[in-house]
């Protein structure tokens, strides 16, 4: 208990949330304070979810230089995680560079070097998409490529079109008291003959009825 108390006092003295102490102690035990002094940016890991600006101020107070490789890499990963919170699975490389430059107040060459290191460490993935270089967190790259493979696999096959599709549609119309438009009938026929179909259209165009 005394170890956690000292850790809480250390965190509080540096204006960091004391609730981080339990998770830190769970991982590092009595060596938690030493681990933080060695690499304050470990707090930006998903497990801790510490605020980047607080961690950055903490690191600078401990003597970490503005162009320290750990700071650069943590800033890049923060931007990737931040954009995930906004619903983006990747960021174009030029946008990631610009955002990280602004976050850390560093030039683009340092950010480029940091991105290269993260790639080599397997902590960031790059992919060419529609003429741009997309930057991913590794787990999101794996998830997105898996979804792509599944969609391609589903789209490759075709179900045989039921011979009575028009008769079945007529039965449904009579039973439910609806009258499908020609476009809706076409969508139903397409759905009956494919493993995968995407139905698009604005509000009130009949997607739900199909």
Region annotations inferred by a language model:
Residues 1-210:
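Conserved ATP-binding/catalytic motifs of P-loop helicase motor domains
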């Amino acid at each position: 208990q005394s170890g956690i108390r000292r850790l809480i006092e250390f965190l509080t003295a540096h204006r960091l949330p004391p609730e981080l102490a339990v998770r830190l102690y769970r991982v590092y035990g009595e060596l938690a304070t030493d681990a933080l002094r060695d690499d304050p940016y470990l707090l930006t890991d998903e497990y801790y979810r510490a605020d980047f600006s607080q961690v950055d101020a903490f690191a600078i107070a401990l003597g970490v230089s503005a162009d320290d490789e750990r700071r650069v890499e943590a800033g890049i990963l923060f931007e990737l995680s931040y954009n995930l919170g906004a619903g983006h699975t990747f960021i174009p490389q030029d946008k990631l560079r610009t955002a990280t430059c602004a976050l850390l107040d560093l030039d683009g060459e340092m950010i480029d070097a940091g991105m290269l290191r993260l790639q080599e460490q397997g902590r960031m993935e790059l992919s060419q998409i529609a003429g741009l270089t997309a930057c991913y967190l590794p787990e999101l790259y794996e998830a997105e490529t898996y979804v792509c493979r599944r969609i391609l696999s589903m789209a490759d096959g075709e179900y045989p079109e039921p011979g009575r599709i028009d008769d079945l549609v007529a039965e449904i119309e009579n039973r439910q008291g609806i009258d499908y438009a020609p476009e809706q009938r076409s969508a139903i026929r397409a759905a009956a003959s494919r493993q995968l179909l995407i139905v698009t259209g604005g509000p009130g165009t009949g997607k739900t009825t199909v």
